[in-house]
Amino acid sequence: IGLFMLGSVATGAAILVAATIYGIGKTFFWPTMLAVVSERFPKGGALTLGAVGGIGMLSAGLLGGPGIGYKQDYFTTEVVRQENPAIYQEYVSDNEQGFLFFSKTEGMDGAKVGVLLAKDPSELTPTQARERAALQDASIRGGQTALRWTALVPLTLAVSYLILLFYFRAQGGYRALELEEEAKGTAS
């Protein structure tokens, strides 16, 4: 909910509320995941916890960052293409970029856009000022749309946790698995 809200709000107070909701949700995700793993697979110990945490962090770094960047480029370019075709033609990149199995997209040329954004607003011609405003607006809207689409990932995880909840209720409730006792009655 918080991530979706971050992609939908524009005022400072609303951003603070959305970030707080996102932070609360994020606070419960990692501990819940690690608690379930440690209680359901106690023999795995620290190695299992480390592997699960490592896979999560690798996924976030190798898939999350580039995936969000791809979506931001895609949606930003679509906004410019639909609303300002002339600006699109001037600032579109010659290189198409893809991500995993998603279609390739032409992002905006970062070098050209960077030169425009680096100029002092008082030095801009009226055309450049209009282009700058359009590109900044498209970038913000593209980033917000990318965040809203990214919210599907934690939504999928939330649904998965609900499925686990129903599964454990059907089994008579959630119980941590105990390590088997050794012959002398001590836990291994």
Q: Which stretches of residues belong to each language-model region?
A:
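A generic transmembrane-helix signature of 12-TM secondary carrier transporters
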Residues: 2-3, 18-19, 158-161
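Hydrophobic core of transmembrane alpha-helices in multi-pass small-molecule transporters
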Residues: 14-29
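Residue-level signature of the transmembrane alpha-helical core
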Residues: 20, 24, 51-54, 151, ...
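Intracellular juxtamembrane helix-capping segments at the cytosolic ends
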Residues: 28-41, 48
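A late C-terminal transmembrane helix in Major Facilitator Superfamily
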Residues: 44-76
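Low-complexity, proline/glycine-enriched hydrophobic segments characteristic of transmembrane helices
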Residues: 66-148, 188
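Symmetry-related core transmembrane helices of the 12-TM Major Facilitator Superfamily/SLC fold
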Residues: 84-86, 144-166
